Amino acid sequence: MSLEMIAVLIFTMGYLLGSVPFGLILARLFGSVDVRQVGSGNIGATNVLRTGRKDLAALTLFFDIGKGALAVLLAHGFSYHLYQQTGCAPDLTLIAGAAAFLGHCYPVWLGFRGGKGVATMLGVSFAAWWVAGVVFAVAWLLSAKISRYSSVGGMVGAIAATISVMFMPASHEIHQVYIALFSGMTILLLWRHRGNIKRLLSGQESRIGDPQ
């Protein structure tokens, strides 16, 4: 099997895993509600919380983080197996992670209308380089707590993780790939938050704890 075909298969695996809309599934199964008809219409944990089900929101957050991490870990395992068999293998881990992030934002099952990718990118960050995951989580929580804006927390976390990757100890080639893919995910994440950014600038963004 060619390297190109392997990369396509890894990307497809990551995308399909990332495209599973856990927020929508959980809200429908246990909350009897279509989360797309609630609040912002997003399928992520923040909007699931607006249904009044903190338990489902927590599960959504867990699974959205988990699918990003799992995509990276599966690709890492495959790369290691390939190395054991052939003596060489490309680093496909972050390709799978970026694909999972893309799948969450643009899931094929929902007409390519998905979430904003914060939790999934957090999972990718933890699995790709745990330091980036810690930086992401701390920056997300602190900025959300200080500003009381969930959107601000997610955007600051993604930017902080990308900056941290610039100091990642790795070969030049791997380092450049990580910087490029983390930067790409952050740019897309900010684009997915463009509505939030407009509301922040106009003073109309909902704060954490505000009634919907």
Swiss-Prot record:
GO molecular function: acyl-phosphate glycerol-3-phosphate acyltransferase activity
Cellular component terms per the entry's GO annotation: plasma membrane
Membrane topology: Multi-pass membrane protein
TM stretches of this protein: 6-26, 56-76, 92-112, 122-142, 150-170, 171-191
GO process annotations (BP): phospholipid biosynthetic process
Keyword Nucleotidyltransferase: no
EC number: 2.3.1.275
Function field: Catalyzes the transfer of an acyl group from acyl-phosphate (acyl-PO(4)) to glycerol-3-phosphate (G3P) to form lysophosphatidic acid (LPA). This enzyme utilizes acyl-phosphate as fatty acyl donor, but not acyl-CoA or acyl-ACP.
NCBIfam families in UniProt: glycerol-3-phosphate 1-O-acyltransferase PlsY
Protein name: Glycerol-3-phosphate acyltransferase
The organism of origin for this protein: Zymomonas mobilis subsp. mobilis (strain ATCC 31821 / ZM4 / CP4)
Family annotation (InterPro entries): G3P_acylTferase_PlsY
Keyword Lipid metabolism tagged: yes
Oligomeric and partner information: Probably interacts with PlsX.
Family: Belongs to the PlsY family.
Annotated keywords: Cell inner membrane, Cell membrane, Lipid biosynthesis, Lipid metabolism, Membrane, Phospholipid biosynthesis, Phospholipid metabolism, Transferase, Transmembrane, Transmembrane helix
Protein localization: Cell inner membrane
Pathway membership: Lipid metabolism; phospholipid metabolism
Catalysis: reaction(s): an acyl phosphate + sn-glycerol 3-phosphate = a 1-acyl-sn-glycero-3-phosphate + phosphate
